[in-house]
From Swiss-Prot:
Protein name, entry field: Major histocompatibility complex class I-related protein 1
Keywords: Cell membrane, Disulfide bond, Endoplasmic reticulum, Endosome, Glycoprotein, Golgi apparatus, Immunity, Immunoglobulin domain, Innate immunity, Membrane, MHC I, Signal, Transmembrane, Transmembrane helix
Disulphide bridges, residue numbers: 120-183, 222-278
Binding-site list for 2-amino-4-oxopteridine-6-carbaldehyde: 65
Glycosylation sites: 107
InterPro entries membership: Ig-like_dom, Ig-like_dom_sf, Ig-like_fold, Ig/MHC_CS, Ig_C1-set, MHC_class-I_related, MHC_I-like_Ag-recog, MHC_I-like_Ag-recog_sf
Gene: MR1
Species in which this protein is naturally found: Pan troglodytes (Chimpanzee)
Region of interest: Alpha-1: 23-109
Length: 341
């Protein structure tokens, strides 16, 4: 199960995290049913996450809901785990029945998957969102609209199920209430339990380097790593103007130590004298790495401007910018030259 979780977590994180400086907290539960599973894969798995942190697991092998975070085990009584274990055993059987029914409808045999994701988000401004959806073989199948109390069906098979589910008004109202009230209440509760982990801030280490991506094509890469929470905004500016259409972005991925990494790149025009700068925002702090022309020789310059950190870096020696929160009205940076490769 540990190896499977290690495989599932990065896939979920890629879907969950976007390039944004606005801090959002989320609670999500993923359930996966597999027909004819390969060796080592349970036929039913349920995992819970607060933000990107796994908090609970259940699978058809152990048949027990268990905590995945110490602060969950410390704060929830044994009867909580037993109660939800019984509920998930029911979900396990339900998924098995529904997956067989879908295979009959589609005339499928062999190994197929049925997935459910339910959860909510608490945004920085206090507003909330909620979501509930199903997928078959990794493709959207049914999506719940809590505002209209209806399901969006993607094909005729899904439409048949949609009609049956929408006939149960009590269940629709229950799902709406769970998404808008119960889920948010649980999320706030879990955020308090794990506040030392979930509400911490670790600033990114940022560096810029120049790389030949193809023969005759050179790109600037702005790379950030070691940061938490995963919400971060990165962009390139050319001559002081943002160039969104010219930028390639990497996914925000876990680094394996509880922090995250990502990058943004832009191709250089070798015939121009454009001035490029990488802008990074994380938890309200803004950094600018100004990149001089390759032919220039400029000493390292760094200064704080209106709460921002500005660093001019010569690319002949790639460097890393480390920034940390300082006492109010004090911002600073430490420049750490990287060893030669």
């Amino acid at each position: 199960m540990g190896e499977l979780m290690a495989f599932l977590l990065p896939l979920i994180i890629v879907l969950m995290v976007k390039h944004s400086d606005s801090r959002t907290h989320s609670l999500r539960y993923f359930r996966l049913g597999v027909s004819d599973p390969i060796h080592g894969v349970p036929e039913f798995i349920s995992v819970g996450y607060v933000d990107s942190h796994p908090i609970t697991t259940y699978d058809s092998v152990t048949r027990q809901k268990e905590p995945r975070a110490p602060w969950m085990a410390e704060n929830l009584a044994p009867d909580h785990w037993e109660r939800y274990t019984q509920l998930l055993r029911g979900w396990q059987q339900m998924f098995k029945v529904e997956l067989k029914r879908l295979q009959r409808h589609y005339n499928h045999s062999g190994s197929h998957t049925y997935q459910r994701m339910i959860g909510c988000e608490l945004l920085e401004d206090g507003s909330t969102t909620g979501f509930l959806q199903y997928a078959y073989d990794g493709q959207d199948f049914l999506i719940f609209n809590k505002d209209t109390l209806s399901w969006l069906a993607v094909d005729n098979v899904a439409h048949t199920i949609k009609q049956a589910w929408e006939a149960n008004q009590h269940e629709l109202l229950y799902q709406k209430n769970w998404l808008e009230e119960e889920c948010i209440a649980w999320l706030k509760r879990f955020l308090e339990y794990g506040k030392d982990i979930l509400q911490r801030t670790e600033p990114p280490l940022v560096r810029v380097n120049r790389k030949e991506t193809f023969p005759g094509v050179t790109a600037l890469f702005c790379k950030a790593h070691g940061f938490y929470p995963p919400e971060i905004y990165m962009t390139w500016m050319k001559n002081g103007e943002e160039i969104v259409q010219e930028i390639d972005y990497g996914d925000i991925l876990p680094s394996g130590d509880g922090t995250y990494q990502t990058w943004a790149s832009v191709e250089l025009d070798p015939q121009s004298s454009n001035l490029y700068s990488c802008h990074v925002e994380h938890c309200g702090v803004h950094m600018v790495l100004q990149v001089p022309q390759e032919s220039e020789t400029i000493p390292l310059v760094m200064k704080a401007v209106s709460g921002s950190i500005v660093l001019v870096i010569v690319l002949a020696g790639v460097g890393v910018l480390v920034w940390r929160r300082r006492p109010r009205e004090q911002n600073g940076a430490i420049y750490l030259p990287t060893p030669d490769r």
